[in-house]
Amino acid sequence: MDDRMRLGAVLVFFTALFFWGNAALPVTAPVEVNYAQTAKEMLAAGNYLSPQIYGNYWYDKPIFFYWELIAAFSVFGVTDFAARFFPALFASAGLLLTYALARRLYDARTAFWSVVILGSCVLYGFLAKLILTDLTLFVFFGGTLGAFCLGYREGRRGYFYLAYACAGLGVLTKGPVGFLLPGLVILVYLVVRRDLRALGRIALPTGLLVLAAVCAPWYVYMYLAHGADFVNTFLGIHNVLRATVSEHAQWNVWYFYLGIYFLGMFPWSFALPLALLRAWRTRPVLDAGTQFLLVWAIVVPVFFQLMATKYPTYSFPAFLPTAILTAHLLRRNTRVLSAGALLGGALYLAVVFGAVHYAPRDGHFSGKAAAELLMQTMQEDDLLVSCGDYTATVPYYTGHPMYALATREEIAARAPKAMSWNSKNVMPFLPLDELPQDRTVYLVVERHAFATFDETLAGGRWELLGTMPTEGREKLRVYRRVP
């Protein structure tokens, strides 16, 4: 089998895995549903520029990923398959990008195994099925640095312009980090190479114009349409606050991204450190391409380790150079490569099979089953409320507004505030003392609020309609109260 046939077979295999079962995987809370709900509302409103959720404009992420979801919903309908379409598609594109870069830097064998290693590692396969921005950023981030690397090696300005265009798309996907972090990688690399004079050869003035042409129109529109509210929320909270105040304090440990590497790169986690140790003993002279991949693989996780907010997927762009380096260092060890590929492929098949068959029966990560139960009897003018953690997938699937039920003191404490993580609490609230007695009310109780319900609401003529899941530990309860 020639190189093209082998590559084609592997790409078809991974692409099939990335799409397999997506129609059976419900949208989950709390993260996936925010993207899906936003795109659903934008499509319904005919609004394709200003992200909105629960009827409110919100500025959690830039526009590009919402455009992906809107496009998928327009073609396939608002379905689970559509919501997961572009992450799976970009996962396949990421493998093609990895192959192309590795092929230019090394050879076809290294490029082939780079694809196998990346496609079979845990985090890549996981993100291929999640409704998140990370694989879109992965492709644009990789395109930015890959194009720079080739432009630097070959002295062709066209590659630099491609890098700026990809960076602009990265800024439209994730914000300033789509340009600033690749820029930092490039700067560190040039320092390592003692070649800062190269900054004069990478088309900086005209390249920045290309970047601005790609991403500036949307940002200018958002500022003109929403003013300081957009700037303060998007840049202030979702960029500056993330960098300076930890959103998940329990993850703020020095070894966080080291742990993500060993878990996310499994079953290849130990291959690269061992190969690097072996190479270090022989002190090889590193070519410019290998140096660049090493800088890329190190700078990204170190940068995010220095940020206050840690998140498992932030260091994901470093997996592309890591996969290529692993393939390059192990290219002659066919036994290790084959064993890792078999283990990774088998593990991914098992995980996807389990997720496809378990997820529809689960009532915690997705409220789809609760929504289906509600839609059997709930009328348009009925009131839907929730108690406990807001299960946002219920209003997503029912299309019915759902109010977070809480005391006035709790609402005041959770209300959005300037430069506070509370700004993410954009769901509608209803004070407990305003719960109407003359209207049919449906109540979704999340498991953390079971005791609260028993203490404060259980005596109010509530009829239990069902629990989710139907087997095992209860995670959601659905009640109804009629006048």
Stretch-by-stretch model annotation:
Residues 313, 351-373:
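Hydrophobic alpha-helical transmembrane segments in integral membrane proteins
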Residues 366-389, 399-483:
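Luminal/periplasmic acceptor-recognition loop/helix of membrane-associated glycosyltransferases
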Residues 1-336, 400, 474:
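Membrane-integral, polyisoprenol-dependent glycosyltransferases
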Residues 67, 275, 393-396, 452-453:
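Phosphate- and divalent-cation-binding pockets in alpha/beta enzyme and binding domains
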Residues 154-155, 247, 359-364, 418-424:
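Short, flexible loop segments at the rims of nucleotide/cofactor-binding pockets, characterized by
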Residues 259, 303, 318, 371-375, ...:
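Generic hydrophobic alpha-helical scaffold/packing signal
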Residues 57, 390-391:
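Glycine- and aromatic-enriched periplasmic loops at the membrane-periplasm interface
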Residues 330-353:
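Signature aromatic-anchored transmembrane alpha helix within multi-pass, membrane-resident enzymes
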